[in-house]
Amino acid sequence: MSQYEKLLLSILSGTKDKGVLFADLRAVLDRLGFQCRIKGDHFIYTKDGVEEIINIQPVGNKAKPYQVKQVRNIILKYQLGGDLHEV
């Protein structure tokens, strides 16, 4: 299992929302094909075919837990995680 798959699995499992590094969350969104634009410390992600806009901000080097949950819900809703979305 690759590092990306392990990271995606930990996000989808929902057991470590407080421990997800901001850079890791960004890497997952980039790998899933989201486009990023940055305004200050706001990282705004969009993707064709996905209605929602994802807006994330770092707290130190971590991602905010509620934003990790929002990303997880979008991945599950649109089945973006490949075979891993069935966690």
Q: Language model features by range: what are they?
A:
Residues 42-44:
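Major-groove recognition helix of helix-turn-helix-like DNA-binding domains
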Residues 2-39, 48-87:
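Basic nucleic-acid-binding interfaces
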